[in-house]
Amino acid sequence: MAAPQSRPRRGELILLCALLGTLWEIGRGQIRYSVPEETDKGSFVGNISKDLGLDPRELAKHGVRIVSRGRTQLFALNPRSGSLVTAGRIDREELCAQSPRCLININILVEDKGKLFGIEIEIVDINDNNPKFQVEDLEVKINEIAVPGARYPLPEAVDPDVGVNSLQSYQLSPNHHFSLDVQTGDNGAINPELVLERALDREEEAAHHLVLTASDGGEPRRSSTVRIHVTVLDTNDNAPVFPHPIYRVKVLENMPPGTRLLTVTASDPDEGINGKVAYKFRKINEKQTPLFQLNENTGEISIAKSLDYEECSFYEMEIQAEDVGALLGRTKLLISVEDVNDNRPEVIITSLFSPVLENSLPGTVIAFLSVHDQDSGKNGQVVCHTRDNLPFKLEKSIDNYYRLVTRKYLDRENVSIYNITVMASDLGTPPLSTETQIALHVADINDNPPTFPHASYSAYILENNLRGASIFSLTAHDPDSQENAQVTYSVTEDTLQGAPLSSYISINSDTGVLYALQSFDYEQIRDLQLLVTASDSGDPPLSSNVSLSLFVLDQNDNAPEILYPTLPTDGSTGLELAPRSAEPGYLVTKVVAVDRDSGQNAWLSYRLLKASEPGLFSVGLHTGEVRTARALLDRDALKQSLVVAVQDHGQPPLSATVTLTVAVADSIPEVLTELGSLKPSVDPNDSSLTLYLVVAVAAISCVFLAFVAVLLGLRLRRWHKSHLLQDSSGRLVGVPASHFVGVEEVQAFLQTYSQEVSLTADSRKSHLIFPQPNYADTLISQESCEKNDSLLTSVDFHEYKNEADHGQQAPPNTDWRFSQAQRPGTSGSQNGDDTGTWPNNQFDTEMLQAMILASASEAADGSSTLGGGAGTMGLSARYGPQFTLQHVPDYRQNVYIPGSNATLTNAAGKRDGKAPAGGNGNKKKSGKKEKK
């Protein structure tokens, strides 16, 4: 039976251990604490804040935390008190087995200072384990011939505690044949042996039952028992004997299972069945049992499972040889496991500061790394480095810790994410290495303005565009990210023709697309200069500018405008004269037209669209000059009607037409006489023409009288000014604006001409009365006569009265005629070239406007030389009322003047008219019948 054990109070022991745990010392930069095992979670270990000189409230601010190497956290920091406390139950036997001292090393990291402090904590053992036998029942066989003093080894109890808490003593239950002897080995182990005190007699007692008790020395004392059954055997007086008391073996940890270590042999001098020996392990713990295998018949020992130096480097076991007579022999086996480089280094990222700003200073800490290799010696020595092409480097910290820092400034626009490879290699043979990837994100700052691909842009838009039409798209690129790369577009405000630029153009602030807010007119706006700004959304925002030139392209949207001949306001057509003696190529008149478009759209060509006598006249393709194509014949009609078309070269082409009436005669009186006496020879009802003329004259007379009455009232109001105008060629004063037409800020006075037409009742004669040397330039056409239209005349009542008072009539003014040098055109005295070239300089395009200004100026001062100036258009005074000048815009960039490239002058020439040859008084001219 087990002896009674005293159990002192456990609380006193725990209190003693807790007091010992508060003691610490600082030596070689390390802090030491101690704490009893099996304490509750949160038990106090030491005051970290005090030992580190930090305020407990600033622990979180300094980033103080515990870092360990892949082990379950046994300790924790109390953030309120700054104390190191247990994180859970600590079992010393699980951590350190039966090591005399159980030391746990942890590290305290102060992040803001970049420092590590080593902490060594000793786990103090308490008596929390009972001594334990591997078996509960033990059978011992003893030969009856055994002599007193014979010793029989008994199983040892195992107590995981250490020191006084470990196994201290054995006790054997009282009996008459056996006693207990305890032997202490070199390593301090206590080995119980059963000693035979008296000779056995199987016949008296064949079996004996004993109880062995194992006790420790802790407080309270703990113990356990094993029942021993002793069987007395028949005579077998020799036990197996091993040749060596101790066997030593070295083995590499990477040896495969099945590898033979050695073979042990025990000899038994007995013969027969008493000499047969069986082998088995004795004194082997549970962890060693599955690692090795012993053949009980041969004594061969082999590896049953792979060994690991890092788990255990030394094994000690006892081998027992037993014969059939229960005689035993024992020996020890010591196995040393040698390390091989079979473990790669481990890299643990304890802290990673990501993302990092791209403008961080060199030397900024990016991460803390912990490196460990489970091998020993050189196999466990590790070196770390990064790739040379990255802007980072590793710096050695304390123990096996490294700091990853920057070597230079970073640029997110070049690299936004760094995949940092940390390579750790040991010094073994062959060396083993490990690569660890660290993904570091670089945070963006607004350090790049938006940029355009080009310094300037040019865009084109057709005129007459739709409002809101897309013109051009601008795109600026900002290499920054997120809001620093969000680009908005705007157009710098300016004015164009007095209006804000924003009323013409708008831009989408998000897409950079330009839109037209108005329909552009090429004739008004040729181009726009814009300044577009691209700004990002960073803080502060950055921006850049780019210039954009927007050109308006011309479209053929303006038809040619005919400047000469102009249509009279009374609805009749203008009359042109061609003498019967005209040779082929004689210049009859010239059609002048302009086009407000430009380029090809303003190139004009002339053609004869319709003629009453085909082949008689021709029109210059580029000059617009109407010339005779052949000599005039007597059979040619007196009045020729021509329709001239003017067409530009746009797409599609636009055109305009003008109708010309050409009278084949040498003078206007002849024209009037022959018009009055003209009678178609093919008409069988020739006698009815007189009736038609009488009716027409009566109608015209009624209209004429009404017109004279109205005109008389108007003329009486302006008689004085008109009188001054005729008597003087000086400065015009007080002339109403209705008598002027503006051409480039010049007003030309419109002279009023009058004539009186007197027709007799007969069919072929008429009398013309010219009360003053001025003639109306508008005659009715033959077609109008045939349609019984009234002959329209313009009568100046005041002039007529003035001439009548003087009792005389001036001779006809010869200025109404055309000389060859006075024909319409740029060079009336020369034949035009139908294949003239297009204008190739700005001076040619300004010719028409200069000629119009010169003509208008002469008409204004009363000394018009429209027909007499060399180098002018050759417009005689007879074209004054018909070619009424309107305001002509400045088309110098797009007007083509057909014909000559000669230099224009505005010199005032003298009139070519001769002095009147007739005497005073009225001159009558009777017309002669045309004979065919």
Swiss-Prot record:
Q: How does it sit in the membrane?
A: Single-pass type I membrane protein
Gene3D superfamilies, sorted: Cadherins (2.60.40.60)
Q: Name one GO molecular function term.
A: calcium ion binding
Q: What is this protein called?
A: Protocadherin gamma-A8
> What SMART domains does the annotation carry?
CA
Chain positions covered by the region annotation Disordered: 804-841, 902-932
Q: What is its main location?
A: membrane
* Cytoplasmic compartment segments: 714-932
InterPro entries in UniProt: Cadherin-like_dom, Cadherin-like_sf, Cadherin_C, Cadherin_CBD, Cadherin_CS, Cadherin_N, Protocadherin/Cadherin-CA
Segments spanning the bilayer are 693-713
Q: Summarize the protein's role.
A: Potential calcium-dependent cell-adhesion protein. May be involved in the establishment and maintenance of specific neuronal connections in the brain.
Instruction: State one Pfam family annotation.
Output: Cadherin_tail
Q: Where in the cell is it found?
A: Cell membrane
Cadherin domain location is 30-133, 134-242, 243-347, 348-452, 453-562, 570-682
What are the annotated glycosylation sites? 47, 414, 419, 545, 685
